[in-house]
A protein has these predicted regions:
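Cleavable N-terminal export/targeting peptides
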Residues: 1-30
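Outer-membrane beta-barrel "beta-signal"
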Residues: 342-344, 348, 368-380
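Transmembrane beta-barrel strand/turn architecture of Gram-negative outer membrane proteins
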Residues: 28-33, 90-101, 210, 214-216, ...
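Outer-membrane beta-barrel translocator domains and adjoining extracellular loop/strand segments
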Residues: 53-58, 106-115, 138-145, 177-192, ...
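Outer membrane beta-barrel
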Residues: 28-61, 65-179, 190-193, 197, ...
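Detector for outer-membrane/organellar transmembrane beta-barrel domains
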Residues: 202-330, 334
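Membrane-embedded beta-strands of outer-membrane beta-barrel proteins
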Residues: 85-89, 118, 162, 198, ...
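Transmembrane beta-strand segments that form the barrel wall of outer-membrane beta-barrel proteins
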Residues: 96-107, 169-175, 209-217, 304-313, ...
Length: 380
């Protein structure tokens, strides 16, 4: 049965691959009144075949929601979309002020325009929305899955912020991200302070590395009760080139009261950061950790193979001991992803990827799924 499913998956992705032929797009760059402007982006097709239960999100990335107890779920699901496609504008003024606005089509669950970047930068000071400073791609293994491996370094998303960068050091004040286990606490959840981050990122020879810290407040205010606690997060990430052909990379993360920054923990993109003790009303933080390891192999001729593993674990023991209902919460999310990518002509990338996703809840219930992803991307 499993071999039949795999054959169906291969046939489906091969059929899509035949369609992956298009002309190369042209970049748009021009100067007006001393402003240097670039229009950039790409068109991208993502197609997936879920060998087991249907775990596809928009952009056909894999989801951990609904993965537990999926043994009896319908299997063999194909789908495709172009929601990852994006377009952006960058301009630099004669005085050196940089402005960037970019969007894609993953908004509203897929198909609507979504703002990715909108910021200005001058003399190391950046204000607006862009990648959180508590993010690094240094230790990431290249994946076709848009949402990638659990446990990669930091928030891995964009947020509004004020950032200052000098050399390899960046400091920022950011829109904070947090949630509670229970709905009543979430309804009264309150952010009184921005998240504070510091990141060091540099390289030396064949080694690239990054380390970061984050602190924020987690609290609630019902009008009659007002409680809060401090949450913290940290990560380290590195990549080393063993030769012209081989790189090895990975990351380690730890959070306590900041699981929104523990990538792909919980249902999909961040477990609860805290809970309210039913007896005292105090805010109690929840800790977690994660990590990734991977390797990339450059085969030459625009071809590469990439293999990565990632896992996140959340510690719900204290919440469970205090009588909070957490049996259905995800305790562990993990994934293996392996892909082959090639560039048939300049600015065109195609690839195929196998992924194995696994989740285990606090209750001990678990589930897993295999899936195959095909991608074709045309840059301009």
């Amino acid at each position: 049965m499993q071999s039949n499913k795999l054959r169906m998956a291969i046939r489906s992705t091969a059929a899509v691959a035949i369609l992956g032929v298009a002309a190369q797009a042209q970049a748009v760059s021009f100067e007006t009144g001393g402003y240097q402007t670039d229009i950039y982006g790409y068109a991208r097709l993502n197609a997936s075949y879920d060998i087991d239960s249907n775990q596809a999100l928009s952009t056909r990335s894999g989801s951990y929601s609904g993965l537990v107890n999926n043994d009896d779920a319908a299997d063999g699901h194909f789908g495709a979309d172009a929601f990852q496609s994006r377009i952006g504008v960058k301009t630099v003024s004669p005085e050196g002020v940089k402005i960037n606005v970019e969007g894609d089509f993953r908004g509203g669950g897929g198909g609507s325009l979504r703002l990715r970047h909108a910021y200005g930068e001058y003399n190391g000071v950046l204000m607006g929305q862009t990648w959180s400073n508590f993010t690094s791609f240094v230790g990431n293994t290249s994946t076709l899955d848009f949402d990638s491996l659990p446990g990669v370094a930091g928030y891995q998303s964009r947020t509004t912020q004020a950032r200052y960068t000098t050399g390899p050091l960046s400091l920022s004040l950011e829109d904070p991200q947090s949630s509670f286990v229970t709905a009543p606490a979430n309804a009264a959840q309150k952010d009184s302070l921005p998240a504070l981050t510091a990141r060091l990122q540099d390289s030396a020879g064949g080694l690239s590395y990054s380390a970061a810290l984050l602190a924020h407040q987690v609290g609630y205010d019902t009008g009659s009760e007002d409680e809060s606690a401090m949450g913290f997060a940290t990560f380290v990430a590195a990549k080393i080139a063993l030769s012209d052909m081989i790189t090895v990379q990975g990351s380690l993360s730890y959070t306590d009261g900041a699981n929104s920054y523990l990538y792909r923990s919980g249902e999909n993109f961040g477990a609860a950061s805290a809970y309210v003790d039913p007896a005292s009303g105090d805010v109690e933080t929840i800790s977690g950790y994660g990590g990734t390891v991977g390797a990339g192999f450059n085969l030459g001729g625009g071809r590469s193979i990439n293999v990565g593993y990632g896992i996140v674990e959340v510690d719900w023991d204290d919440a469970e001991d205090d009588g909070v209902a957490v049996a259905g919460q995800s305790e562990s999310n993990s994934a293996v992803m392996a892909n082959y990518q090639w560039t048939p002509v300049k600015n065109v990338m195609m690839g195929v990827e196998y992924a194995f996703l696994k989740r285990e809840n606090v209750s001990g219930d678990d589930g897993d799924a295999s899936r195959i992803l095909f991608a074709a991307q045309y840059n301009f």
